[in-house]
């Protein structure tokens, strides 16, 4: 049986077979330019990620899932606005092109983090045997969205986890220590493409992390995501028994999913705080990549 000790996350260029297939579907279904660290970490455990993805994907194709992520995103912005702007940008000497690139990078993570949070809440509900409401009996059709990465989305490029630059390496070490994380998340590694900017926002964010209002806001985001996940259209056929049958330790899978469910509200909140320096809250509360409304007769969310 595959234990769940820390393993090397599977990079996008390392993926083959079923993992390559799932990575492609993640990019297309979540409408994102790359695969984030939490999903790449799960890919290290053989059949786990394909089974998890296939169980979740019917819901992830739906407008209901997109709307749920939009609601989490708007709540994160409201919480960030109450905490207050970081005011970290002034005096950095960034050029116009750098300003635009940073804003685009923030849009990428501001879009995907709420989706990952709802996805993780849904996975835990199914895995824990929690009831996920089904609307099959209440609606003749489930509204789906078009797949595909938005053409204006920033590529998910990032600095290596072990950077050569000693200042960036020290910054990553501080982020890991402060957040008690075994690795630096994709968000920070992308922002490290502009190390002066990351250093500035991290120095402003770090003292906020210890504030009670920050913890309450993060807990509230997690509660919202779980409540919204309960009302997604399709049940999640991924039980502890099925995971065990795959040869993966179910208890440690649950521990990792719980870890992600604690982490992702804070990532969503942090990116909202970063982005408030660039964009007013009213605009930031709207999806940076809204989707067209389309309606299909759906069977399990598949097309």
Predicted stretch roles:
Residues 1-303:
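Hydrophobic alpha-helical segments
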